[in-house]
Amino acid sequence: MWRQTLFDGSDLGLSKPFQFTNLSSIVLPRMRKSMIFLASGELRAYLEKTGRSGGGAHGHLEECTRSDSSGKQFCLIKTSNLEDAGIQTEAFIQWIVQKTLEAEGLGSRVPRVYEIFRNENNSVGFTMHEVLDSKLCGRFLSESRTLERDIIHFLAQTAAILQRLEERLELDHRDLKADNLIISAKPSSMKWKGITIESPFTVHIVDFGFACMGNSGITQMDASDGTLPPLDPCPKEGRDLFHLIVSFYSIPSVRTQLTEPLRSLFSTWLTVSDKSCAGMAEKWLSTEWLYLITSQKKFSNPSCRPEAILQALGPLL
């Protein structure tokens, strides 16, 4: 179990092994004047910002070139707009998620974390691999000429990734939507219990700022920094894929092109406790309403479990 495991954080520049139960006591590398120094004072990496940046309400992203003893890498720097705001927990969750997938041969599906550091003002940030030649899923869908096929493969790839993470880490992303998937042009091949997913593109999951990891449904690690209820069970059955499916269905150009049998599958997936959420997804351009549903302690949608999605999509792949 990850809670009792002592992790080697040397690839993050940490001098000592750590446990997820004591993240606050970890001595992080320091960033000064675009240089990252280890606790020993040794220079670890130099960051050269390219000038392009972006972000949202809970974090800021900047593109940069990272140089270390192994060469140069294109990466992103993520810092918080608020004081820490759980960004240290977010970074460590993304790190263990990527490491877990790497052991399965799927390490590229979540950007690698290079280091987690403290700035000169003592706030926390981290650097991560940048997925090049990629598009946000929402934009990819708007440009797609094979929309239904692409949706089937988006959902199948994402479900195969989440199934592994739920099984090994009891992880919920809790903010999975079209624009938290990045699509790169590299072909993908995945397998799950006899189902083969051969796709002309690769799905990458990003932004773990609301993620949690649990233990028999009890949240143990929470990156949301109080944004979500502290007793919110983790994981919740079907939550992540329900979020993603609602975000797809809320795009008018997507739902109007759905045909059978995918239309019927969406109808099933959008039903929670015998009540359809399709009407709300059609009415509201924003998907904020769905968090009122999934934040309920007893939320459950068995049809949106990763295994259920994969079984439903298997005949369509």
Where are these regions (language model features)?
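Helical subdomain adjoining the active site within ATP-dependent kinase catalytic cores
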Residues: 3-9, 228-317
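ATP-binding glycine-rich phosphate-binding loop
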Residues: 14-69
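Membrane-embedded alpha-helical bundles of multi-pass transporters/translocases
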Residues: 41, 48, 61, 66, ...
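ATP-binding glycine-rich loop module of kinase domains
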Residues: 50, 57-104
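Short coil/turn segments at secondary-structure boundaries
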Residues: 78-80, 140-143, 216-221, 249
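Conserved structural core of kinase catalytic domains
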Residues: 105-149
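Conserved kinase catalytic-core helix
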Residues: 144-174, 178-179
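Catalytic activation segment of kinase domains across protein kinase-like and atypical kinase folds
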Residues: 177-237
